[in-house]
Amino acid sequence: MKPGGFWLHLTLLGASLPAALGWMDPGTSRGPDVGVGESQAEEPRSFEVTRREGLSSHNELLASCGKKFCSRGSRCVLSRKTGEPECQCLEACRPSYVPVCGSDGRFYENHCKLHRAACLLGKRITVIHSKDCFLKGDTCTMAGYARLKNVLLALQTRLQPLQEGDSRQDPASQKRLLVESLFRDLDADGNGHLSSSELAQHVLKKQDLDEDLLGCSPGDLLRFDDYNSDSSLTLREFYMAFQVVQLSLAPEDRVSVTTVTVGLSTVLTCAVHGDLRPPIIWKRNGLTLNFLDLEDINDFGEDDSLYITKVTTIHMGNYTCHASGHEQLFQTHVLQVNVPPVIRVYPESQAQEPGVAASLRCHAEGIPMPRITWLKNGVDVSTQMSKQLSLLANGSELHISSVRYEDTGAYTCIAKNEVGVDEDISSLFIEDSARKTLANILWREEGLSVGNMFYVFSDDGIIVIHPVDCEIQRHLKPTEKIFMSYEEICPQREKNATQPCQWVSAVNVRNRYIYVAQPALSRVLVVDIQAQKVLQSIGVDPLPAKLSYDKSHDQVWVLSWGDVHKSRPSLQVITEASTGQSQHLIRTPFAGVDDFFIPPTNLIINHIRFGFIFNKSDPAVHKVDLETMMPLKTIGLHHHGCVPQAMAHTHLGGYFFIQCRQDSPASAARQLLVDSVTDSVLGPNGDVTGTPHTSPDGRFIVSAAADSPWLHVQEITVRGEIQTLYDLQINSGISDLAFQRSFTESNQYNIYAALHTEPDLLFLELSTGKVGMLKNLKEPPAGPAQPWGGTHRIMRDSGLFGQYLLTPARESLFLINGRQNTLRCEVSGIKGGTTVVWVGEV
């Protein structure tokens, strides 16, 4: 080496030695745990600013920082304001993975990042030789991450307040401007991407924080919201992280009406649009559907549409959709369900003598309401109208005032609406008495002798009453024998002692058999309607108190109390009930049953899958599978403090109405609403109280109680909405009520209600609210109630086409003519007739 070159190298070494010593002061000297790569990463960056400022600045920095000692994670720089040397936290560390645990409980990728974090936070963080933070993983939770983002926006608002013009914008636009401002501040190199190093530079100092961030830092933005996993955040991803979206919904799309035919599938698509739109949330009656495991709403598709696999009338109603986190902008979908007509005619066949009046009736149900037309032997009868022939109740009844031989024929009722048509035939034969055929004689004398009757279970056995003639057609005395066992119907406990029969509940099984409970004898009798005999007795658990027929599965459910204190209740099921003889008695697994409810069928809904059980003092209803007799789920009512007492159901909109037990004698028995689609409690049914009763077509809900002077009438619209028609105040509470089809207007109903303390009957026309009273009835049954419950004064109707109703008095029965709204007759000498069944055509 040349002598000059030697002295030059020596001079440079001497100039750089103080700077080198400045980085190795005792307070900052590196121990053996510091990687070589880290020191190399920190030192070159110490001169990053001075390189840009030229050689003179470089020499000045070397001279000034030579005596300035900076701790790890920082470097010496000249202050632009004062020109004096100062320590500044490192902007970044060279990427390397030598993980360590900090004394703050956090995990760091290397020592440099630990020291840099200590510098930025202004607190001491040392290396802990423990594996706890490795096992614990990242401590930043979703809750902490949400709090972090709120803090970032709050600090940004403090650092860069919105301008006057911006502050007048809506909150969503203000938030968008704030997030854009934060993004620009974080994007140090201005390339439109936030890297981990840029996010790491934005460390929140302790003095800026009003709340704990639960182990989160700005670097966690990459962990949670780097959707394309490219280790950087674009403005679009930054928008999504802070839920900044610009959503739109056209005014004409705010309410969308979708009409679908029952049994088909349908798709509801949300019209809320916008860049970066979050996932769509669907709700029904305020309950989120997306996360429920529903049988018929189970696929939301790639475009977040709502897919209903098989639409039924319970699905009708309102559905709303909105982008997650933006509930203020929502679309309402009104789902209307159309149902093709279903009709019944009455009678299917009749024979009349010339000169008498004849009526042919047709009942049709469907959505929209079907239109009815009549054909006689294929010809439209509307072209043959005369004084003799007329159409009543919007065409639902064809009336011939005086029949002639030429009126003989097949009369076809046709019901039609927008989605279908149905028809059935009612035949009319005109023959004088001398020309009666054997078939007509049998139809008149045999068929009518067992069908279209009230079967009354009284103190003196079983009494069959024909309402047209007001006569007792058949009387099965208590001493008559049971066909299969030869026991007496009502055995006497002591000789020469007359003891009344005791009945509590009876059901009609397909107009073939009547099942009736005898609580004191712990058995159920099976009455053969055609043979007019008691066929057999079925022994059940002690004190059977309630029977219910599940037509869909041909089962009779029997609730027994065990004793009068209901201390050992049980629920049994008699299968194959319509066979009359080959039944099986099955014990269900349910314990502590206080009551149960099986929804009724109707023309549109002919299959019921589920029933409901109430347990004593339990604020819940338990849903059971009627086929397997196994529990499915529990619908809790404890949030509403409701112990269920009674239930009703309408298939229109799928509502269950639950009557709660009274909290005190002075309080009213309020009601709750349950949605059968989601099995969720919707809340109180307004101010409605009392026991709910649903009309046969599911359109009207009438609520009343024996201890309340109020009667509430509600209607379900074709859109599945519950509307209160009116509330009536009456002088006495309602003991029981029955629905009667209107004879003046098709698809309308009236009710007849037995007053609790007065002998009168209340008549109400549901469509108009017109009220009347039927007087001159005798006092209702008196005395203490039976130990197994039940009302003293019942009301029983006579089926879909019947015009008669029955209610008991103390020692007689009263028959009401619903067509004429008058008292038909009184049948005397019948005591204890509070268990009654109507039997239609046999």
Curated annotation (Swiss-Prot):
It comes from Homo sapiens (Human). InterPro entries: EF-hand-dom_pair (IPR011992), EF_Hand_1_Ca_BS (IPR018247), EF_hand_dom (IPR002048), Ig-like_dom (IPR007110), Ig-like_dom_sf (IPR036179), Ig-like_fold (IPR013783), Ig_sub (IPR003599), Ig_sub2 (IPR003598). One of its GO terms (biological process) is negative regulation of collateral sprouting. Its main location: secreted. Residues 81-135 form the Kazal-like domain. Glycans are attached at N318. GO terms for cellular component: extracellular region; secretory granule. Residues 251-338, 341-426 form the Ig-like domain. Residues 1-22 form the signal peptide. Ca(2+) binds at D187, D189, N191, H193, E198. Keywords: Calcium, Disulfide bond, Glycoprotein, Immunoglobulin domain, Metal-binding, Repeat, Secreted, Signal. This is Follistatin-related protein 4. It holds the Pfam family Ig_3. It is found in: Secreted. Residues 174-209 form the EF-hand domain.
